[in-house]
Amino acid sequence: MKVLFIADPMASFKTYKDTTYAMMREMAKRGWRLFHTLSGELSVKNGLVVADASAFEFLGAQDDHDKNWFAAADKVQTALKAFDAVIMRTDPPFDMQYLYATQLLTLAEQQGAKVFNSGQAMRDFNEKLAILNFSRFTAPTLVTTRSADVRAFLKEHGDIIIKPLDGMGGMGIFRLTEKDPNIGSILETLMQLDSRTIMAQRYIPEIVHGDKRILIIGGEVVPYALARIPQNGETRGNLAAGGRGVAQELSERDREIAETLAPELKRRGILLAGLDVIGSNLTEVNVTSPTGFQEIMKQKGFDVAAMFADAVAEWSVR
């Protein structure tokens, strides 16, 4: 198989924990031909969606800081439909450039490319707003552009979390209580004087035990979750915010949530998704670049990357 990864520069990968690296390593073991491009290197020429793609040989990292784990050839402009699979792994934020990239990916799919996750799925399934489709699994939630609404929500619940709809890695997330002296300045900053839509949720105290990332691949639930434990004094468990990842078996509630969402995600053409769960509450559905493969493999011995590669092979011929 020929597989194109649309991802951040490979020299920037933290190979000891990077999920895209784990995907590439597994596919290289299978003898698949691997290519890399940046989202900014997508374009349309003579009606075809093309990428400045470089074939690369997977050499493997010798230590955690090895930047020479690959050997890349010169870039060649290649139509996306020439690959057996195109894997979109560019991190958010989901800004206008990201939106344009998904639109080009949708056009490429119309031309015969197999893209995972599909451009339409990434556009339609906002990672924060997606939980509103499954409200029986969520804590009380507000979506608004009005700071007055947030103040009323805070008065009702006493302790809330507010966050932007386009962030990642815990960026822009604040915890507010009624006694917080900085409510006004936080709302002004995050909501940009009532011009930016945000989400507010009742604070879930179980966050002190971490939030859990539950992976769904090809409509099947990975049997282990990655609990992300916040640092002392933090309310964010995100690994990018300094959280510590601990792999653990799914609880009955975890499995109920995941098995309810899995068929809907599959129906929408979402090959890989990461559900974020705090306590018994679904808080996010990540469809852009879910992580956690390496931590689960190292701690539990379950080969998530192999499960993913199997799904790519199956879905690419559908």
UniProtKB/Swiss-Prot annotation:
Q: Does the keyword Isomerase apply?
A: no
Q: Where does ATP bind?
A: 154-210
Enumerate the catalysed reactions. Answer: gamma-L-glutamyl-L-cysteine + glycine + ATP = glutathione + ADP + phosphate + H(+)
List, alphabetically, the GO terms of the cellular component aspect.
Answer: cytoplasm
Keywords (A to Z) from UniProt: ATP-binding, Glutathione biosynthesis, Ligase, Magnesium, Manganese, Metal-binding, Nucleotide-binding
The protein's matches in Pfam families, at most eight in alphabetical order, are given as: GSH-S_ATP, GSH-S_N
> What pathway is this protein a component of?
Sulfur metabolism; glutathione biosynthesis; glutathione from L-cysteine and L-glutamate: step 2/2
The Gene Ontology terms for molecular function here are: ATP binding; glutathione synthase activity; metal ion binding
Residues the record lists as binding Mg(2+): 284, 286
Q: What are the names of the required cofactors?
A: Mg(2+); Mn(2+)
The EC number(s) this enzyme carries: 6.3.2.3
Q: Which residues form the ATP-grasp domain?
A: 128-313
Q: Does the keyword Manganese apply?
A: yes
Q: Note the InterPro entries from the entry.
A: ATP-grasp, ATP_grasp_subdomain_1, Glut_synth_pro, GSHS_ATP-bd, GSHS_N, PreATP-grasp_dom_sf
Cofactor, free-text remark: Binds 1 Mg(2+) or Mn(2+) ion per subunit.
Q: Which family does it belong to?
A: Belongs to the prokaryotic GSH synthase family.
Q: What is this protein called?
A: Glutathione synthetase
